[in-house]
Amino acid sequence: MRQRDAVRQIACSVLFMLLIGAAAAQAAGTDVADAARRGDRDAVRAALARKADVNAAQIDGSTALHWAAERDDLEMADQLIRAGARVTARTREGVTPLQLAATNGSASMIDRLLKAGADPNAPLTAGGDTALMMAARTGKTDALRVLVEAGGNVNAKETWGGTTALMWAVSEGHVDAAKLLIGAGADVSARSNYVAAANGRGFEGRTPVASRTDPKTEEFASGWLTPLTLAAREGDVEMARILVNAGADVNAVAGDGKTALALAIFNGNYDVASLLVDSKADVNKADAQRFTPLFYAVDRRNMETAPNFPWMVTADPMPLIRKMLDAGANPNALVNNTPRARMREGSPRIVFATALMRAAFAADLDLVKLLLERGADPKILSRDNETMLSAAAGLAFIHGYHRGKPPEERLQVVKLFVELGNDVNWHDDYGITPLMAAANYGSVPIIQYLIDAGADLSAHDLGKKNDGAFGSSNEPLMPIDYAIGVGTFVPNNAVIIHQDAVDLMAKYMKERGIAHTTSECTLRGFSCSQVKVDPKVATPGEIVRARKFATGHQIEGLTGGLEAK
């Protein structure tokens, strides 16, 4: 046993000494790289005089020439190249001196490396990025010119996203770089790779597919971008003008079907959109979700404000809307969909039939009048048979979330649609009436107007608008229930009580002998707890305080009409 331990100790000692020796040899062998890393030209010169290996790499694979390129030290680079430095050397991550020079946008360093044998078209990353692409990102035209004159391919695509050097210049807003590339023959209508919705970026192991040439698009797909769509997305008017003048296709569509015009409007870049309309962009081209440029402009005029959308506070697309209508935009183009951004933010479904319905939902009186003047049909129904009146009255409107005009203006919009023939007692496919929509919104003057116009206080919905979600129930509800908050459209079961609206409707129901038939259990939010509340005499506040919430489903034992135990 002792002999075995002694042998093991000797072996460990020998191994340790070998490692120390190897480390010392490594340190001694990287004198040139170490000196270059420090930027010490004298030390580099001295090491080379001692015949130190000019290509010896540090532990990460960096050579002296890498450090010279990184530091943009031309004198040191010349010295190393004369001593035989390999310009194609790669670090362990695959980085070459040319990649570092291109990232810096150093024309002189790029020129030195190219003359020493570097390939201007070599893929410098695993994704196939070239020096021209990297230089384009810096915007330094002298660096680009050196690469182009050395034979750099201006239309080469990196292999992951399929982008070109021109796309990189456009995305970064480098106008002069874009001009140089276009002058050198860059394709202004080149496309990036198409990314199917099921193969979207951000999912592990999934990458864009090869660029497509067929016109098929799909909802929620991405990619398939052109330099012009990138300029539209970034809001770069000058860049967009350069590309249009160079012959870019103004109607090319991205993977989700958006044209540059739609993409500009979607991002609030109305100056670019105006330029594209002037350039004969198709103002009626719908994307894969059926949204037209006109709809996006109407939506953005009244879109929910968020910190990451500062332009929503200041920019007004109304002049653009007028320009698109003048250019032939169809105000009756059927959309029958909900904007994706609204769905992703947790807002309930509200299906907009046309741009007019979106304007009605926001109670944007000026915009509603403009669209009507230009031929918008006030009687078009959504796919759920919802009317313009219901949208204007407050269908699915969430206070504190949705952006709309003041109640006084909303009342004027409601009156307008009633005068145009919208039925005050129309039931949509969920049984919801305009009065229920108004009760959800909670404006007493609007409710009063609809009651005076003949709205039915005894109406019942079909109990299926939310399928038990959002704090609602599956029991048919009355208009007053929407004011109480039972028919809420608010996510996370938040309760919004409109006490004045409840009082007004209760008064009329009492005068007209209309019974409030909704069960106690439903009024208390699915929960038949030990707390007893008589919904026929209790105030809405007392009812709500007694509510116990079930999130997204019914409490066990409560089914169908949610009858109270």
Segments (PLM) and residue ranges:
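Ankyrin repeat domain, specifically the short helix-to-loop turn at the C-terminus of the second helix
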Residues: L48-D53, D78-R86, D111-D119, R145-N153, ...
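N-terminal segments that cap or nucleate solenoid repeat domains
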Residues: Q26-W67
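Conserved ankyrin/ankyrin-like repeat signature
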Residues: A43, E75-M76, S108-M109, D142-A143, ...
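Leucine-rich solenoid repeat scaffolds
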Residues: G468-S527
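N-terminal secretory signal peptides that target proteins for export/translocation
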Residues: M1-R8
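Ankyrin-repeat boundary/"N-cap" motif
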Residues: A28-D34, A57-T63, R90-T96, P123-T130, ...
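Bacterial N-terminal signal peptides
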Residues: A11-A22
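Ankyrin repeat A-helix N-terminal signature
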Residues: D34-R38, W67-D73, L100-S106, M134-K140, ...
